[in-house]
Curated annotation (Swiss-Prot):
Belongs to the CheD family. It catalyses: L-glutaminyl-[protein] + H2O = L-glutamyl-[protein] + NH4(+). GO terms for biological process: chemotaxis. It comes from Methanococcus maripaludis (strain C7 / ATCC BAA-1331). The keyword Isomerase does not apply. HAMAP family: CheD (MF_01440). This is Probable chemoreceptor glutamine deamidase CheD.
């Protein structure tokens, strides 16, 4: 079964399931515990929420990661065994120098927040100007990244 994660949402599951999301300027924060075969994806839309009691914690990098870790530990994962992968953050719209590059800001915030909780980023597929679809296999933690006809495993 494939669990689809919508914008600003968080999805967690156990093997043999997989988790999928479609990304543009948003960033997927992907956490996986290889020993327990448990993983999750947060579909981060924006860098930071000033409200730590956010009702939609998956929407922001600073609230998504603690919530994702909490949900994974409830499924049996151990925080010290989690590895992180990141994907997305494309510059989807041509912008002038006065426009904020949301994709770039999402990348920076996601990396910062992953480091803050002491996790290592094992691999990433970030930036560019093309959207992508990612699929996390909970059997082995591999992430298939599809950009048009291009396929890549991170």
């Amino acid at each position: 079964m494939v669990l689809k994660v919508k914008m600003g949402d968080i999805g967690v599951a156990k093997s043999p399931e997989s988790i999928e999301t479609l990304l543009g300027s948003c960033v997927a924060i992907i956490l996986y515990d290889r020993g327990k075969k448990v993983g999750g994806v947060a579909h981060v839309m924006l860098p930071k929420s000033r409200n730590t009691a956010e009702r939609t914690p998956g929407k922001y990098a600073n609230t998504a990661i603690p919530e994702l870790i909490d949900r994974l530990t409830k499924l049996g994962a151990r925080k010290d065994k989690l590895t992180a992968k990141l994907a997305g953050g494309a510059a989807m719209f041509k912008c002038n120098s006065n426009t904020i590059d949301v994709g770039k800001k999402n990348i920076e915030a996601s990396k910062e927040e992953v480091r803050k909780v002491g996790l290592r980023i094992a691999s990433e597929d970030l930036g560019g100007d093309t959207g992508r679809t990612i699929t996390l296999s909970l059997k082995d933690g591999s992430v298939l990244v599809r950009k048009g006809a291009e396929l890549k495993v991170i």
